[in-house]
C-alpha cells in the first residue's frame, strides 16, 4: 500500500518563500516495475463528449489565500496572576476548527479575533465554529493573563501562501492550478478559502531532489496590483480554481489553445511535462508508465528528459500543476512525487480537473 503525504509550507508576510509542496508518495522501484507491464493494455476511447480547448501554462505563480474564518492550530495554557495555568478552550475547540464569528460578529482575521476577545469584559463568548462541515456554537469564558489582557488560549492561522504551477486557463478566463488541494501543514486538513489571489513569482533557486528527499523551488512572490494575475475562489481535491486578471489575459495573446483529452485517450508511452525550470515554460520528455482511466487515481509518470533530470533530479515541490501533453493534447497535470524515487510520480487527468 502506497502512502501519500500532502503538506503545505506556511509563511507570514514574507517575500522569499519555498514552493507549495507537491504531494509525496512512498514506494519502491519494484512496485513500478510490476504495474508497468499491465499498463500497456490501453482502453479504447468510447467517450464522444467533446472536451474543451484550454491554454496550457506551466509557469510558477505566487499563491496567497485567506481562510474562511480563522483556523485553530492548537489550544494553549495561559499563565494567570493566580500563579496557575489555564486553558479556556481545551476540550471545546479542536485542531482544524474554523472560528467564523464571535457573539454574531464575523471573524476573518487574527486581529478581529484578538479584538473581540479583549473587549469581552470578562463575559462568556459564543464562538460559531465550522468543524468537518458541521456548524457549532460553543460558549467560552476568556481569562486574564498576567498583564490583565483577556485571552482564549488558542493558536490560529488566517492565511497561507506559497509557489505553485498554473496548469491551464480556459477560453472564458477561468484557471486551474496544482491538481491537488492545499492542506494545512499542522492539521493536514484542506484549507477552507475565503478569498485569494495569484501573483507573479520568480524562481531564485532549485533544490535538486534525491532518493528519500524531495527537491523544491525557492522563489520570490511579488505582491502588488501590477503583478496580480487572478482571484482564487476554490480549493478542491483537484486543485485551486479562479478567474484570471486583465494582465493575465494579455499574456495569453502569445499562447495557443490546445485540445484537452478524455481519460481513455491517455496511453502508456512518450509524453511531455511543461514547466519553467529556466525562466520560461519548456516541454520535457516523460514516460507514462501506468494509466487508470476507470478510476479517480490518476496515472503514473517517469521523467526521462536528461536536461530536467540534471537540473531538478526529477519531480520536485513546486511542480504541482505542471501540465502534461501527449499527442498534441493536454492530458493532465503532475501532482505527486515518489519520495524513494523522485524521477517517478503521479498525475491527475485533465478531465478530472475540468470536471471538479
What is each stretch, according to the model?
Residues 4-56, 236-284:
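Interdomain regulatory linker/hinge segments that flank or connect interaction modules
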Residues 101-134, 341-343, 347-354:
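PDZ domains, with a preference for the canonical peptide-binding region formed by the helix
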Residues 40, 44-51, 61, 94, ...:
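PDZ-domain C-terminal substructure recognizer with occasional recognition of PDZ-binding tails
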Residues 143-313, 317, 326-327, 335, ...:
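Serine endopeptidase catalytic core focused on the charge-relay Asp
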Residues 88-110, 324-327, 331-332, 336:
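Conserved PDZ fold ligand-binding element
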Residues 62-94:
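PDZ/PDZ-like groove recognition
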Residues 83-87, 105-114, 122, 133-137, ...:
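Intrinsically disordered, low-complexity linker/loop segments enriched in Gly/Pro
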Residues 68, 95-96, 267, 320, ...:
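Short, flexible surface segments
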Amino acid at each position: 500500500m502506497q502512502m501519500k503525504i500532502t503538506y503545505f509550507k506556511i509563511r507570514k508576510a514574507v517575500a522569499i518563500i519555498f514552493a507549495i509542496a507537491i504531494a509525496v508518495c512512498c514506494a519502491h522501484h519494484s512496485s513500478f516495475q510490476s504495474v508497468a507491464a499491465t499498463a500497456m493494455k490501453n482502453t479504447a476511447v468510447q467517450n464522444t463528449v467533446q472536451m474543451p480547448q484550454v491554454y496550457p501554462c506551466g509557469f510558477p505563480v505566487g499563491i496567497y489565500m485567506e481562510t474562511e474564518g480563522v483556523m485553530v492550530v492548537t489550544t494553549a495554557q495561559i499563565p494567570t496572576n493566580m500563579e496557575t495555568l489555564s486553558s479556556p478552550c481545551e476540550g471545546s475547540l479542536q485542531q482544524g476548527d474554523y472560528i467564523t464569528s464571535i457573539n454574531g460578529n464575523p471573524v476573518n482575521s487574527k486581529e478581529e479575533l484578538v479584538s473581540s476577545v479583549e473587549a469581552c469584559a470578562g463575559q462568556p463568548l459564543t464562538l460559531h465554529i465550522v468543524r468537518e462541515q458541521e456548524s457549532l456554537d460553543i460558549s467560552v469564558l476568556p481569562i486574564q493573563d498576567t498583564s490583565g489582557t483577556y485571552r482564549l488560549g488558542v493558536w490560529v492561522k488566517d492565511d497561507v501562501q506559497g509557489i505553485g504551477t498554473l496548469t491551464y486557463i480556459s477560453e472564458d478566463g477561468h484557471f486551474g492550478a496544482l491538481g491537488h488541494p492545499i492542506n494545512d501543514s499542522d492539521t493536514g486538513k484542506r484549507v477552507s478559502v475565503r478569498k485569494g489571489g495569484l501573483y507573479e513569482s520568480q524562481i531564485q533557486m532549485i533544490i535538486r531532489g534525491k532518493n528519500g528527499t524531495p527537491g523544491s523551488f525557492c522563489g520570490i512572490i511579488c505582491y502588488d496590483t501590477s503583478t496580480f494575475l487572478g482571484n482564487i475562489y476554490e480549493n478542491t481535491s483537484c486543485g485551486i480554481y479562479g478567474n484570471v486578471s486583465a494582465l493575465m489575459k494579455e499574456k495569453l495573446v502569445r499562447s495557443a489553445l490546445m485540445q484537452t483529452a478524455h481519460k481513455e485517450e491517455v496511453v502508456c508511452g512518450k509524453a511531455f511535462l511543461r514547466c519553467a525550470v529556466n525562466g520560461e515554460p519548456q516541454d520535457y520528455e516523460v514516460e507514462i508508465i501506468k494509466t487508470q482511466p476507470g478510476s479517480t487515481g490518476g496515472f503514473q509518470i517517469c521523467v526521462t528528459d536528461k536536461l530536467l533530470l540534471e537540473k531538478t533530479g526529477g519531480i520536485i515541490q513546486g511542480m504541482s500543476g505542471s501540465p502534461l501533453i501527449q499527442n498534441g493534447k493536454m492530458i493532465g497535470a503532475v501532482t505527486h512525487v515518489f519520495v524513494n524515487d523522485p524521477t517517478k510520480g503521479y498525475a491527475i487527468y485533465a478531465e478530472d480537473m475540468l470536471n471538479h
